[in-house]
Amino acid sequence: MTLQKDFLRDNNLGLLLLRLTVGGLMLFHGLHKLFYGVGFIGGMLSQMGLPTWIAYGSLLGEVVASLMLIAGLWTRAAAIVFAGNMVVAILMAHIGQLFAIDPMTGGWVPELPMLYLMGGVVLFFTGGGRYALTRGGIAD
């Protein structure tokens, strides 16, 4: 067992780090909504003429799916819910800014939700890896 062969080239370790990072960071957003409510999202939905109860779906994508990603529990299924949640977030909050650059930072305005979205997409295609709770099933 060598450092380079067994550790530095371990794709499964990379998938674990991706799951922990994407799921862990999104969990903060979800817990904030869980403890303080989804009124902000409900207001955005109301302005779009949509029912406000749909805002509770963000808890599914930001709390439940994030915890599943962290644990590696049905990773592919969790990742598609997670990514779908981010598509909705981008469409609701950034649809008018898809081609905008932040003048203060020079960054793309929707870059953070896009990073979360792509993290979910990658995990959907790869699965959770060897260090996941569930492995080998269609939802894993």
Regions found by a protein language model. Give the residues of each.
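Extended, low-polarity transmembrane helix blocks
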Residues: 1-32, 53-60, 64-140
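Membrane-interface interhelical connector segments
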Residues: 35-49
